Design a protein with these regions (language model features):
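Catalytic-domain carbohydrate-binding cleft regions of carbohydrate-active enzymes
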Residues: 1-253
Length: 253
């Protein structure tokens, strides 16, 4: 019904559960992925925490995620997709690169309480000097309504301090699950009829980043940790999370 629409799947663990529940559905997903109607993104096993996790755990996220995609879909993924993680440590660019990926997408940093993050398209440089092409969708949400109001908010935010206006609009019901529905897609179809707004093109994440690659020499460089000012005290007030995470890491070793 909507041949232009592409659905994104970002976590192999979800695919494992789908296959356990319905192998028929899993085979349909594989077929749709070949057709370009579904796009696998992320290159990691789940959308993981980067602050408490040790370096071995981070590396294994990439190892097992990419291994799963290669074995089940025949190829690796070229981007790390972490829309809702509470901050990103400064060694992550190096780990992303060693995981076979060249691109990074997050949304959460736009939730800073006091200091607005200054870039949407930028080069993230890790503490060792590794650089990753990165994108922060300017609407600042993974629950976009794909409405004229959504697009105007996106336009206003990116025009404040950007010279490269390419951006993702990630629409659907992202927090709590469900994804896009027909209403969202119908809005996207109609939104280009509004002459006062920038044009929207249905596509996929890899195509978007490949377009940004051509402009990366124009992008600013941000060095070090991507610190999230929101959700302060998450790890301090719930210290048992850190304790049990470390216990599990020791058991894995």
């Amino acid at each position: 019904k909507y041949p232009e629409f592409t659905f994104v799947i970002s976590q192999p663990q979800q695919l494992i559960w789908i296959k356990e529940h319905s192998n028929e559905m899993f085979e349909r997903i594989k077929e749709y992925e070949k057709q370009g109607r579904i796009e696998i993104v992320g290159g990691a096993f789940v959308e993981f925490d980067t602050n408490v996790s040790g370096e071995e755990q981070l590396a294994r996220q990439m190892l097992y995620g990419q291994k799963y995609y290669l074995e089940n879909f025949g190829h690796y993924v070229n981007n790390l997709w972490l829309p809702d993680t509470f901050g990103y440590n400064g060694n992550l660019p190096q780990i992303i690169k060693h995981g076979g990926m060249n691109h990074f997408m997050t949304i959460k940093i736009s939730w800073n309480r006091f200091n607005a993050f200054p870039y949407h398209n930028f080069i993230w440089e890790g503490i060792d000097g590794t650089r990753i092409l990165s994108h922060l969708p300017p609407e600042g949400t993974y629950n976009s309504g794909a409405s004229p109001k959504s697009l105007k908010s996106l336009n206003d935010n990116i025009e404040k301090n950007e010279t490269i206006y390419n951006s993702l609009m990630i629409y659907g019901i992202g927090d709590g699950g469900g994804g896009p529905n027909e209403e969202h897609i119908e809005r996207v179809r109609r939104i280009n009829d509004l002459m006062c707004l920038n044009k929207v093109e249905c596509g996929n994440v890899e195509k978007f980043f490949n377009g940004l690659e051509k402009k990366k020499n124009e992008m600013p460089i941000f060095k070090g940790e991507l610190y999230l000012e929101n959700h302060n005290g998450t790890y301090t007030s719930q210290s048992f999370n850190k304790q049990y995470n470390r216990k599990m890491e020791e058991k894995i070793k």
